[in-house]
């Protein structure tokens, strides 16, 4: 197969592992930056054309057809990356994950709405309009409170407000910059630990526990969190699979937290990193992803 990965940083561990796995299984993979693409719609066939310009000095060229596309772009490239995905979808190419699912996952509030609508437990959460006074929301959420920007990743834009007035001050400061924030209950009993599940299709292929270090409440590996192996029950795995399906994703990193009320879904990541979970679990996740693409790209082509 001829595969395309949409990625701005081809040297990243995850991108290199996926390219190695594809090559090992006899496939060719190109890695291209979606921000170097331009898209053309035409009434005459071919209706969907994608051109690529390597740099400001080079001449754009028309991209050839691919059997499958893997989106691995970050939050700053979501809009253009998903537009490129939509163009490939228009051409009938199998995309892992779809553009709509990617957009769902990148919007934290919409993700929570979709999860709760599907009956999946999430922390109590609030989102308020720009004209709502921050003080008015305080009685409706726990203290301490977690504050999150709507489009952050890797723990960036996540703040713990220890006291109600601290939450008010932080929200009012962000409001001045037109950045919306959601509020969530702080799950104190979980301490500084959460669980990452790697879901492919209808299977949890790997899990790990992440533990924040040196008083850091965020357990994200990018924030220095320590990882260790963890075994989940079938019921807990099923929640991760259901969360992935609720967002519409084929492949996802699902973040879970154990609370007094049971397991809660914190977030569903459309482009989860491979490095720490592969090293912690010892599982070749990259090969599992390529296997999934082989099957589904073939089904899509029939």
UniProtKB/Swiss-Prot annotation:
The keyword Cell membrane does not apply. GO terms for molecular function: ATP binding; metal ion binding; ribosomal S6-glutamic acid ligase activity. Its cofactor is Mg(2+); Mn(2+). One of its GO terms (biological process) is translation. Mn(2+) 2 binds at residues 267, 269. This is Probable alpha-L-glutamate ligase. It comes from Haemophilus influenzae (strain ATCC 51907 / DSM 11121 / KW20 / Rd). ATP binds at residues 148, 185-186, 194, 218-220. InterPro entries: ATP-grasp (IPR011761), ATP-grasp_RimK-type (IPR013651), ATP_grasp_subdomain_1 (IPR013815), RimK (IPR023533), Rimk_N (IPR041107), Rp_bS6_RimK/Lys_biosynth_LsyX (IPR004666). Mn(2+) 1 binds at residues 255, 267. Residues 112-294 form the ATP-grasp domain. It is an enzyme of class 6 (ligase). GO terms for cellular component: cytoplasm. The gene is rimK. The keyword Magnesium applies. Mg(2+) 1 binds at residues 255, 267. Keywords: ATP-binding, Ligase, Magnesium, Manganese, Metal-binding, Nucleotide-binding, Protein biosynthesis. Binds 2 magnesium or manganese ions per subunit. Its EC number is 6.3.2.-. Mg(2+) 2 binds at residues 267, 269.
